[in-house]
Amino acid sequence: MRLLAEVGYAETTNARVALETGLTRGALLYHFPTREALLDAAIAHIQSARTKLLQAAVDGAPKGADRTDHAIDAYWRLLHETPFLAFAELEAAARAEIQLKARLKAAQEAFDRAEIGDHLFDLVQGGEGPRFQASRDLARFMLEGLARARLTYDGKGRTDRLLAVVKRAARMLNRKGSLHDLWPES
């Protein structure tokens, strides 16, 4: 998982994994005879780690805090953690590799349908239905896109402004704010 996040998919070879983990190549090949077997195990491991981090964010929600703000801040932090970086690297690599795309599909669907929805639902305590799903999707996909962006100037300022807009938009969709709150003049 760490190698995927740090050096990327192309450089995460069986030989590199063996070297970094201190295993002989033979020992690694005994447990993972093919790159595909290693990938399947890595995807399952990464998925489990992402789920645990999301649950910890739910469990760590401060009492009395704005749940929408907490959910967005928590997910933003998680997107910079190794399991999320590794999964993003696999998703990027899957664009050009059909077999990897097929291997990732189940994990992506599980995360989209269950884990991310349930955990963010617990975080924001939103309602059900298309409006609230749109709120969660807006926040999730904006944050994921922003996490992958390479802002070339004023990165912190631009990021902070975008995070504030995402929070206000999510509140509006959750009927906790007005359209005029999206970009207040001040």
What do these predicted ranges mean?
Residues 32, 77, 90-96:
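Short helix-capping/turn signature of helix-turn-helix
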Residues 37, 41, 54-84, 135-139:
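Hydrophobic alpha-helical connector segments
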Residues 101-105, 121-186:
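Hydrophobic/aromatic-rich alpha-helical bundle segments in the mid-to-C-terminal region
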Residues 2-37, 41:
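Helix-turn-helix
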Residues 50-56, 78-88, 98-126, 134, ...:
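Amphipathic alpha-helical packing segments from all-alpha helical-bundle domains
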Residues 2-6, 53-57, 86, 90, ...:
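Solvent-exposed, amphipathic alpha-helical segments
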Residues 44-50:
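Short, basic, alpha-helical segments at the C-terminal edge of helix-turn-helix-like DNA-binding modules
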Residues 61, 94, 150-154:
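Secondary-structure edge/capping motif, primarily at the C-terminal ends of alpha-helices
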